[in-house]
Amino acid sequence: MEYIIERIPFPYDTIPAVAAINKDGSYTIYENALCSEARCERAVRLLVDEITKE
């Protein structure tokens, strides 16, 4: 089961991506055709870092 978190604005960028964090802690990116895979992964890692801080 995947959980959609939210549309993520990239730092200093206007291209959004949709991230889902899976139950096993991995993540899935959706709607990333307009950005490079590396940037999408970075955006999700930033989101995951924020979530796990709390």
Where are these regions (language model features)?
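Auxiliary, metal-adjacent structural segments of Zn-dependent hydrolase domains
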Residues: 1-27, 34-38
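Active-site recognition of the HExxH zinc-binding catalytic motif
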Residues: 42-54
